[in-house]
Amino acid sequence: MTEETAPVAPQRFGTRVRSIHGDHFDDPWDWLRQRDNPDVIAHVHAENQWAEQVCKPAQELAENLVSEFDSFTAPVVYSAPQRVGDWWYFQRQYHEDSYAKHYRVSASHYPDTPVLTDSETLDGEQLLLDENLCAQGEEFFKVGELVPTADGRLIAWSQDTEGDERWTWIVQDASSGDIIDQRVSDAGYGFAWAADSQSFIYTRVDDAWRQFQLMHHHVGADADGDSLLLEEPDEAYDLWFSASNDPWHVVVHSTSTTSGGAWLWDPYAPSVPPRPIVAKRDDVQVNVEPAGDHLLVIHTALSREGSLACIPLPQEGAADSVVDPDHWVTLYTARDGERLSDLEAYRDFFTLSYRRDALPQARYYRRTRPLKVVNGKPVPASDCSDLWTLGEELNKEGTIRSLYPLSSGRFEDCLVRVGYQSVLTSPTVEELDLRTGKSRILKVTQVPNWDPSDFTEERVWVTARDEHTQIPVTLVHRRDAQPDGTHAGWIHGYGSYEVSFDPEFDILRLPALKRGVVHAIAHIRGGGEMGRAWYEDGKKLVKTHTFTDFLDVANYLVDSRWVHPERLIAEGRSAGGLLMGAVTNAQPDRFAAVIAGVPFVDALTTILDPSLPLTVGEWEEWGNPIEDPEIYALMRSYTPYENVREGVRYPAIMATTSINDTRVFYVEPHKWVQRLRQATSQVPDQSPIVIRTEMVAGHAGASGRRGRWQARAQEFAFALHQVGITK
């Protein structure tokens, strides 16, 4: 095998020339952006063939990994049932299936939440949707949401058959399965039924894949006649919403990464545009949750880590329905080390999600006075200052555990439902009955052939190079492993958009753990693990903190002798792929192998082009290099594609992408791979650079359980081979 056999895309200067802030760059490979060009598609196919050839020595290991993923999968994986109206809705995925099946069972048979098992079916259960049948003949298939009507007559579900996250909504008769409507396409995320189950609202995306319109659709009508209820003209903002537990209100948000506003839609008057309730304010984020007779809101007007407040409902017929912040009643403000994040409200209680000690936590609040309903509508609360008790913690014992409140279904339920998991703890759902104080386990994901007691999971804190910042790290390894400097290691990171990379269970990690690989999740700045301040200390002009934190954790793994200096694998996806490119440019000899999934490695080109999807909104994350020379210079110094080092040996790299990815275009990693091969002093047999492209998929990669297994097994086998694990 020689490097010359790797596909070479010719350089074509003049395709994209950049001159800005005194800097000039002529991009020789930007022509690969032309997806309709036969030369581009031929090149992509050639790269796939080359990757297959390079990975042949690891093919047996990849096949073994798929078999092991299969062995760790229970005969049936199921969800905890959720109540909507008079039915319990749930799903199962059988061992032999790539996709789930959706069911329901009458609540008349099961007044309390039914507990599913691997071997038993429920009395009177009905199959609503078999995704496996729907996926037949499709190269890519994904169901987004399935939403039943309150009366149980209809279900609506969204599907994507391209991987571009432009959804088609399908409405079926729940009893017969007959399709009634599939006219709504090019939809974004979000769906809510009108109270009469005759119509629904959804979001529409523009050419830049921004959710910019709120639409109202009558079931059975032509989608061309759908009503526009709300439009967000500012390209920095996206509209989003989800159905509420509260049956009388749905909150529609418009948010950027720093601020937002909110509107209130009435399902009983579905054709009426939503009323504004919270006006946008610079640098103030809001997350509003309806609670029947008032609203709850998490906002950042008082603290960047969040405050919890009550908001009165806007008065009917009032000319101005925006609620003055002076009338908000503060219930709680984040303490040091906390970050308030989300709400889930019911008639008699609500749950508050927050972060503390780099982990998701939760507490619940009980209502002190009953909700009053007159003529089928809630009476607005005149005073909510003493409407709620002090919060009670829901957190589970354990050093490392991610805990999330889950919806139980009905607004009138007195059931607090939480899910929790960790790298070693499989997903578990528990339900607390507030009437009795008793709790019970609704679901524990079974994992055959796996004993978590053979491993240990701990939190360590790594001192950053500034000598005072403490970086949290989740460290997992075999219980019998010692820090003797011999082990292979695998470090994961993300560090952008205030997204938290929490310790969660994934059977795909298990084969490497059983082979003695030490796993580390670096909870670096730019992510949300330690709150808003942690995020802001890793964006815009201090973005490089994200990269140096990751390198400091990687160096710690070697210096502490948990990992052999030549056996460390690094992995990141999307913005985490930018991280992979930046850290390999900075310290290429630190890693033996790098997996860069859908990597954002041509960041500067993208952020300089407002016509590309998501770019305008991204300026709040990265800064605006068009207007700000300092931001331009900083991004120019770290964008991976433009900073590959000449004549230096890099680690083995596998980049993956999808031709239909709307978030990170396939062209970015393809350009990066060409530049890496041209500039670096690689020894192909020892440290190959390859790229695999899914021809029908999106940002999340291949669809279907087994499709994902096969794709990930190829990545894992490639990386493990580089650190001497070949079986």
Model-derived segments and their meaning:
Residues P7-Q49, V66:
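Mature N-terminal segment immediately following signal peptide/propeptide cleavage
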Residues S108, D173-G177, H218-D222, D266-P270, ...:
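Short loop/turn segments that connect beta-strands within beta-propeller blades
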Residues P38-V147, S158, Y237-A291, T330, ...:
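Non-catalytic accessory segments flanking enzyme active sites
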Residues T121-E145, A156-Q159, G163-R204, A208, ...:
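Asp-box/WD-like beta-propeller blade repeats and closely related beta-sheet repeat scaffolds
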Residues R166, R204-D207, Q211-H217, D226-S227, ...:
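Beta-propeller blade termini and top-face loops
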Residues L129-T149, S158-D164, D178-I180, L434-K438, ...:
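Cap/lid segment of the alpha/beta-hydrolase catalytic domain
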